[in-house]
Amino acid sequence: MKKFNQSLLATAMLLAAGGANAAAFQLAEVSTSGLGRAYAGEAAIADNASVVATNPALMSLFKTAQFSTGGVYVDSRINMNGDVTSHATIITSSSGIKAIEGGSASARNVVPGAFVPNLYFVAPVNDKFALGAGMNVNFGLKSEYDDSYDAGIFGGKTDLSAINLNLSGAYRVTEGLSLGLGVNAVYAKAQVERNAGIIADSVKDNQVKTALTVQQEPLKFLDKYLPSKDTSVVSLQDRAAWGFGWNAGVMYQFNEANRIGLAYHSKVDIDFTDRTATSVEANVIKAGKKGDLTLTLPDYLELSGFHQLTDKLAVHYSYKYTHWSRLTKLNASFEDGKKAFDKELQYSNNSRVALGASYNLDEKLTLRAGIAYDQAASRHQRSAAIPDTDRTWYSLGATYKFTPNLSVDLGYAYLKGKKVHFKEVKTIGDERSLTLNTTANYTSQAHANLYGLNLNYSF
């Protein structure tokens, strides 16, 4: 277990964990051709160099070098509706619990639009062996609430990106069987900000102020630490963290019209460093010192099939399983070994199923369509910072060949998330004398429009 000078970092990374386009903070947008079929058949289809990101064994199907670059723009529309209340528990008061303040927890469009880039290259070495390299984003999220948001202790700003750099090789074992193996270096950035919100109003209450005067530091000066709603109470920023993993794949081609593929991507541990933390944990509300936390990006397995039914029509499908239960809890301790943080996450393993079809209209134009169902990972414990939900994908796409070597992929997907109701609770203070309990009740609604564009070139 890593040791900490402050418990902030564990708090921050708990909060930095979805959006309308992925379970928890996993992203599916590795290519535009895949977007057009709702990423059905990803481990079995080899229509461009993006196979580097899905199943490296598919590189054995290429006869010439392939290059692909582009990205997907994710236009999320996630709205939060609800209320937030702050209560003070004053042990020395005969009134016991008193409601101090109430406010709105509603906010619109809390996840801003984001561009998810990709870049791939595949080079056959001979009839049996091929090499590939790629850059894509498998995990990431961003959510933003106003600085003066009443439920700022739950909202604020969260920004996590993890750029995956991959080197892969593929080997054709027999005419039908191919194997692939790759190594991954993940470059990650994280920024988390939380604000006082309604807590700043609570500590201005005269009874609370009186109770604060007999507290130990730093609670004694809590009203001075939190002068306004936009006061930062949680802060983390790390712009350069690395993690490493591997991936493997197998592909079996029964004939040119039928193949199946299985791909596995290992977990990746990202070591974040917090150098100047701020925390509102009990008795810790000041700048912290250096601390570390390892966040695990989960491993996942995908099984896919591709079947060319006629000269023009093909169908494809996928089942993807992500091992989110690796993130059951976050633990941290101070340098002296005392517990700083122990939080249950209750993430659940999730499944994604997809079905798609491709139609070769003529030699230049290929059309695609797909549908998918993606299960939420945070089904038992949700967060305003991560408005995760079950979602359904509806996708359309096309590839147009300008020349035998140059083509462009276009893709669109509409994602509709289920309405979700949940509650978040935060307590600060000393339970022996004074605590401030903040509770927010939320209803979240999410949908998103995804637009993709990729250019492909065959040498």
Curated annotation (Swiss-Prot):
Chief place of localization: membrane
Entries under InterPro entries matching the protein: OMPP1/FadL/TodX (IPR005017)
* Coiled coil segments of this chain: none
- Signal sequence: where? 1-22
> What top-level branch of life does the organism fall under?
Bacteria
MF terms per GO, please?
long-chain fatty acid transporting porin activity
Regarding the membrane, this protein is recorded as: Multi-pass membrane protein
Disulfide linkages recorded for this protein, renumbered to the chain, are: none
Which cell locations does it reside in? Cell outer membrane
Alphabetically sorted, this entry's keywords are: Cell outer membrane, Membrane, Signal, Transmembrane, Transmembrane beta strand
- GO CC: one term? cell outer membrane
UniProt lists the family membership as follows: Belongs to the OmpP1/FadL family.
Name of the protein:
Outer membrane protein P1
